[in-house]
Amino acid sequence: MDMKTAEILCNVTSDFYRAQAASFSATRASPWHGWRRCVAAMAEALGVVGCVEGESVHGEATPDGGAGESARCAADAGVRPGVSVFDLACGNLRFERYLVEALPHADVRAYAIDSCDELAADAGGLEIPVTYESSDIVGGLIAGAPLHELHHAPQVDMAVSFGFLHHVPGEELRVRVLDGLIDAVRPGGCVAVSLWQFMNNPTLAAKACVTHAQAGEALGLAADAFDEGDYLLGWKNVEGAWRYCHHFSDEEVDRLIDAVSSRARLVDTFEADGRMGAMNKYLVLQKVR
């Protein structure tokens, strides 16, 4: 994809979120099912206690049904490890609210970044300290800046990005985001991302084909301006409410993992979310250097 097209798609998506922030946020109140396993996998890799409902890296409950023996001992001793989290494209900060129940025996501090202040303003009810920063991540990447130049968060224990990578146009930029998330964590720190596979759902796939054709014509974008897996999706039948989204094939997921394999090891990968439990592919990585 050429950078001119990428800029257009970036602007279309930014305009969508600013205009539809309230209605979009209203549909994003509950945690995604995949988050539970992501946090459990990262906590286990980091040796952090307090995984939600005692899940192990593979989502299996500990024998006591709680957070495991180490969590109980830590809680009894009054030990609360500090855990720092970087959330790229935080939206309405619902992941930060989820962390309170996911890591009940840890002192969590979050650094959150998004380009849509209207979404973040709808947060409220936060029980952990959160430093929020407004930044046009995709626009900065298109301009050539590395991710670490687009925010001011310190290196953290965990870096996550959920529901964002499918808005990043072009495989090269998506690799740069994943690289930047690895940069954001300390040595041994963990990264978790979700990769949307919406075209595996026949209903969503049919809608995507219709809205993509309509939006492409309205925006004057030829079919060959897009990469394979690229679509312009609608929103609640609102006229002109389009956002750029990329469907991740299994082959591209493998390429993403390979692209960062010298810097991070794959801790876990799985599918979750949606009615069939397979709307998102998740990757959990641990930084080795």
Model-derived regions, located:
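Short catalytic micro-motifs in class I SAM-dependent methyltransferases
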Residues: 163-167
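Conserved helix-to-beta-strand junction in the class I
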Residues: 180-187
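Local beta-strand N-terminus motif with an aromatic residue
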Residues: 82, 155-156
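A short, conserved alpha-helix within the catalytic core of class I
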Residues: 168-180
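A conserved beta-strand element that flanks and buttresses the S-adenosyl-L-methionine
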Residues: 160
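Class I (Rossmann-like) S-adenosyl-L-methionine-dependent methyltransferase catalytic domain
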Residues: 1-58, 64-149, 172, 190-289
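Structural motif
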Residues: 148-151, 183
